[in-house]
């Protein structure tokens, strides 16, 4: 869970505050939705324990980003799905990114930034 709010008379920036205590889950994603899979991955980074995701094949941008940032993620490729395991992340190295295109392409980076300890809010 998270709470969302806006600053100064309902203007941007959007403020997202995560729950203090999340529990890890086992999640079965069978629609091939990279957005659903990524959402659970990001939540798993804040959850106690190990979050396990069994996901139908879909875009792997979030997985590649997690590996690039050396986050505690493991991916096993199966015939019809991927099994992703992710542990709680205490710190995410902050980086500057230039993200072209539409907002949906940058949504994952926005969430990752919000989860980062040194992000400006």
Model regions: which residues?
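Structural preference for solvent-exposed beta-strand-turn elements
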Residues: 1-121
């Amino acid at each position: 869970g998270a709470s969302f709010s806006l600053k100064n008379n309902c203007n941007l920036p959007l403020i997202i505050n995560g729950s203090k205590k999340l529990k890890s889950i086992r999640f079965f994603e069978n629609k091939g939705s990279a957005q659903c899979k990524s959402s659970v991955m990001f939540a798993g980074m804040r959850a106690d324990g190990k979050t396990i995701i069994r996901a139908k094949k879909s875009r792997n941008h979030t997985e590649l980003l997690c590996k690039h940032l050396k986050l505690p993620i493991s991916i096993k490729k199966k015939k019809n799905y991927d099994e992703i395991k992710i542990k709680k992340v205490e710190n995410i190295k902050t980086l500057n990114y230039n993200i072209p295109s539409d907002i949906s392409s940058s949504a994952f980076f926005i969430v990752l930034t919000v989860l980062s300890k040194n992000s400006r809010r």
